[in-house]
Amino acid sequence: MLDIQLLRKDLDGVAKRLADRGYPLDVAAFSALEAERRAIQTRTEELQARRNSLSKQIGAMKGRGEDTSAVMAEVGGIGDEMKASAVKLDEIQARLSELMLEMPNVPHESVPVGRDETENVEVRRWGAPRQFDFDVKDHVDVGTPLGLDFETGAKLSGARFTVLRGPIARLHRALAQFMLDTHTQQHGYSETYTPYIVNPDVLYGTGQLPKFAEDMFRVEKGGAENTVTQYLISTSEISLTNTVRDSIIEASALPIKLTAHSPCFRSEAGSYGRDTRGMIRQHQFDKVEMVQIVAPEASYAALDEMVGHAEAILQKLELPYRVVALCTGDMGFSAAKTFDLEVWLPAQNTYREISSCSNTESFQARRMQARFRNAQGKPELVHTLNGSGLAVGRTLVAVLENYQNADGSVTVPVALRPYMGGVERIDAPSSAA
């Protein structure tokens, strides 16, 4: 959530910056609510002052033995008006809160202005795409003989679900373990296991609600009546970041660096017809997430660090990739600045997103009331960052395509072999040695 004081001080400036990311701020609605709020608060202050004056007058009159009934009646009327004003003020504050919850974060000044992904800016590339001397297959054709089973996934759960078997399942598990070990042993993150089902207020905290309810899977407790609807997490960013909600952290405890491996559940409501083949866009997929909770002055250095941590995974796997700075029109709702990592997929002859690393500044912290005690001993909002480290399914796709061989086998990246019992390549069961 944005700082309402920022809007009060520079409403037109905020509106312009939000317009850069495609959000039309309703300046008239905000201004009208603010004017009404100020009028009620001013009137309430006047009434309070009048009531205080009358209370003193009543005391003096009683001391002189005078009749105070008329003055007391006026005080009673003032009390009634103040109660009505308080109710009206609560209504206005609620409407302001609703308006604020719909507003995305303000882009950082360094974010390139653009309408959509076509105007993102490439920052750098790493690695050269492999030159194949045979016809390249996509991950579906490579993986199906090795245990990638879309037919059974569809039979069990419908479209955009997959069953992994045998060597493919083992490779998928190896990737997740390798990512976790790298982040915990080399990058300083603390491995964390959190619930996959969360309450609505948790999703308000990280910005998925109220705007993106249609992208979530809702769950209800069987056999229970009048229960609160809960949600399956779309990323473990949600649960990891909310571990610091409603808390004041000592400055000495910062930065807090957390990582988790979890399934992620997304309805993909706005993705009809996109990436319908294979594992690129699934309703359920695994991801290793990185989250950092930091002091405000450290957040952009932390963003660069986090991007480097995601890059390290791709470099160890020797997968070519590029880093892209997202433009204003392509950033996520809560982000002030985002870098995407895109991995090379030879069958598509292009780079595809495999990680997104974002600094939300104080946007999520304000919603969560996550604070730290600053040098002056006063509570101050932390900055929160999140990044994929990496999406496990898409990394599996990249390994299958980049490490495929002409005979249908797949070479196991050197970094993964300790997690595969020393296996150097995987073959279809029918042709395995």
From Swiss-Prot:
Q: What class of enzyme is it?
A: ligase
Q: What name goes with this protein?
A: Serine--tRNA ligase
Q: Subunit composition?
A: Homodimer. The tRNA molecule binds across the dimer.
Primary localisation category: cytoplasm
Molecular function via GO:
ATP binding; serine-tRNA ligase activity
Q: Give the EC number.
A: 6.1.1.11
Please name the InterPro entries in this protein's record: aa-tRNA-synt_IIb (IPR002314), aa-tRNA-synth_II (IPR006195), aa-tRNA-synth_II/BPL/LPL (IPR045864), Ser-tRNA-ligase_type_1 (IPR002317), Ser-tRNA-synth_1_N (IPR015866), SerRS_1_N_sf (IPR042103), SerRS_core (IPR033729), tRNA-bd_arm (IPR010978)
- A Pfam family (short name) is Seryl_tRNA_N
Q: Which UniProt keywords apply?
A: Aminoacyl-tRNA synthetase, ATP-binding, Cytoplasm, Ligase, Nucleotide-binding, Protein biosynthesis
State the compartments where it is located.
Cytoplasm
An example Gene Ontology CC term for this record: cytoplasm
One GO biological process this protein is involved in is: seryl-tRNA aminoacylation
Q: Which NCBIfam families match?
A: serS
Q: State what this protein does.
A: Catalyzes the attachment of serine to tRNA(Ser). Is also able to aminoacylate tRNA(Sec) with serine, to form the misacylated tRNA L-seryl-tRNA(Sec), which will be further converted into selenocysteinyl-tRNA(Sec).
- Record-stated family: Belongs to the class-II aminoacyl-tRNA synthetase family. Type-1 seryl-tRNA synthetase subfamily.
Species source reads Burkholderia pseudomallei (strain 668)
Residues the record lists as binding L-serine: 235-237, 289, 388
Which gene is the coding source of this polypeptide chain?
Answer: serS
Annotated catalysed reactions: tRNA(Ser) + L-serine + ATP = L-seryl-tRNA(Ser) + AMP + diphosphate + H(+); tRNA(Sec) + L-serine + ATP = L-seryl-tRNA(Sec) + AMP + diphosphate + H(+)
Domain notes from UniProt: Consists of two distinct domains, a catalytic core and a N-terminal extension that is involved in tRNA binding.
Q: Which residues bind ATP?
A: 266-268, 353-356
Pathways per UniProt: Aminoacyl-tRNA biosynthesis; selenocysteinyl-tRNA(Sec) biosynthesis; L-seryl-tRNA(Sec) from L-serine and tRNA(Sec): step 1/1
